[in-house]
Design a protein with these regions (language model features):
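N-terminal secretory targeting modules
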Residues: 1-61, 65-72, 81-83, 111-121
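Conserved SGNH/GDSL esterase-like catalytic core that processes O-acyl groups on lipids
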Residues: 57, 65-135
Length: 135
């Protein structure tokens, strides 16, 4: 589980968990959503024999949607990697934004975690509701 989620659970108070709240907390955080169903698992996706992305390197930068929150960290990056036989680099953290001036913003993570010397064929940046809901 992501450290931010754990911190959020602790901040919400352990009493909710102690009072039968574990099920409710898991349900609220997405662990019982359809995205976790076996029928949606990335391993079931057939790959394309011919794809313009085959063997290409694709970078995905984003927040929870890119990370695959509520789908056990399987999201469109894994789907595209499997379907199109490409190399995916996923840099995603729940609750982050493009514009915040903090250590886990998209820009900071791109600077800190993505090798500028790496050959990249496609760059996909997920703009999220986190940006719209923050100052």
């Amino acid at each position: 589980m992501d450290a931010k989620i754990i911190a959020g659970i602790l901040a919400a108070g352990g009493a909710a968990l102690a009072a039968g709240g574990v099920y409710r907390m898991n349900k609220k955080t997405g662990y019982f959503k359809k995205g976790n169903s076996v029928r949606y698992d990335v391993s079931r996706i057939p790959f394309k024999k011919t794809s313009p992305l085959k063997g290409k390197t694709v970078v995905f930068l984003g927040s929870s949607v890119t990370k695959g929150f509520a789908a056990h960290n399987n999201a469109f990056a894994e789907y595209i990697a499997k379907k199109d036989s490409c190399i995916c680099i996923k840099e995603a953290v729940n609750g982050t934004t493009l514009i915040d001036n903090c250590e886990d913003s998209y820009i900071e993570r791109m600077r800190d975690n993505l090798d500028p010397e790496r050959q990249v064929d496609l760059f996909i940046c997920q703009l999220s509701t986190n940006d719209a809901t923050r100052n």
